[in-house]
Amino acid sequence: PTITIKFDNSATFETNLERIITQKWIALFPNGIESWSEHRRTGYPKLLPVVVNKGRNVSTEAGMRRLMYPNEEYTQNSFHLNNAINVLIKESSNNQGGDTGGTHVWWDRKANE
């Protein structure tokens, strides 16, 4: 659905929340990591779907959920990295888990629709 700028007291709570979060996302846009985190946290704004998805376990609808660990972690910190990956697998809300871009982190609970 198209979200207008004007706040509407007769609209549903979720519609008004979407309006507020969309404006917040626009305000955060110059700080890409913050706007991306806000989108992952809330599911708003509704973004255009990905046309070509070459991501490993990344949902076309939900998009990238987290950054993967850098290669240096695998070579220089493998013990702690494996412990962290096991936590990701155990606590993932989407049952994908592991060190992939599609793994939901602990605070990423609202699914993007």
Region roles according to the model:
Residues 1-113:
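C-terminal functional modules
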